[in-house]
Amino acid sequence: MAEISILGAGGLTGKELLLLFSRQKEHEVVHITSDKLAGKTISEVFPEVSFPKNLVFKKHEDIVPLKSLVVLAVPNEVSVESAPKFLDAGHKVIDLSGVYRLHNQEILEKYYKLKHTRFNYINRAVFGIPEIFRDQLKNADFVSNPGCFSTSVILPIFLLGQLRKNLRPRIIVDSKSGVSGAGGRTEDSGYSYTSVYENFRAYKILSHQHEPEIREYVYSKSGLSDPEVIFTPHLLPVYRGILSTIVLEFDSEPEQDLISILENSSLNEPFIRILKTPEEIELKKVQHTNFLDISLRKRGNTLVVVSALDNLVKGAAGQALQNINLMTGAKETLGLLP
């Protein structure tokens, strides 16, 4: 169906992509890069990944096969220049960094701490949550894959349907993440598993880059006046998974059965699971899957929504494959369900 090139295939998300691609036969990975691992084979680096072709890692600057779809799993500053380069060369591109998600340049540069020299490409990117932007993704040549925390918040709120119009413009989010989603791609020892074992802490309070992402896309899809988002991420002593608790307020108490609304909104969504009670939401139920589990509870005007996903799958590589399937006309669930 499609030839795939993965730049940054030696990182956590890159490895997860290789695992997912190894489980299907319609897309073919033809090119992988990692400056640190150049010259080594997949089996040398990831012996647990059973891949049809034992590809050799190339350097980032090596020539990418002409007709391949390019997946960028590289640092933010690399994606700024790489995405336009490959688009201009005729490639379809999926960018897993955050530098093509936000449409306000000042806010983007503030939260990502860089100068964005290719901001004119922002409007070309489709935000890659398939459950919201499926029709646009089918015709996209450039997809900005969403953040893991952002997916866990934006999608549950979107599934409230028309009730979003009754929400007050203030959203409080408390998210817990394993180390692979909270900085595990960096060499910062503060995010290593040894530093969090028997430990627990908050980080990037009121400064996390997914906060403006949540604000922008909840606003654009809900009709809320520009919502205030108070987002606090925490670092769990586990490897993978995100659990988010989202507190919302309605102008007046909704009379509808909210679980039924979620169930109806997600009726044809293969990766959304609605559970009857928030207490049923657990990381172990979503780890190594592309599922997003959601539940909620209401008291008066207050609504508490709980969601969970695997940050490396639905929060990154799995959602990227879901988008690739849509972009190439493949079955959306290809490589993502048993």
From Swiss-Prot:
Known pathway: Amino-acid biosynthesis; L-arginine biosynthesis; N(2)-acetyl-L-ornithine from L-glutamate: step 3/4
Q: Does the keyword Lipoprotein apply?
A: no
- Biological process annotations from GO: L-arginine biosynthetic process
For this UniProt record, the keywords arranged alphabetically read as follows: Amino-acid biosynthesis, Arginine biosynthesis, Cytoplasm, NADP, Oxidoreductase
Its EC number(s): 1.2.1.38
| Chief location | cytoplasm
Provide the protein's localization. Answer: Cytoplasm
Top-level division of the source organism's lineage: Bacteria
Give the transmembrane region(s): none
Q: What does this protein do?
A: Catalyzes the NADPH-dependent reduction of N-acetyl-5-glutamyl phosphate to yield N-acetyl-L-glutamate 5-semialdehyde.
> Which family is it part of?
Belongs to the NAGSA dehydrogenase family. Type 1 subfamily.
Its name, as the record gives it, is N-acetyl-gamma-glutamyl-phosphate reductase
Gene name of the record: argC
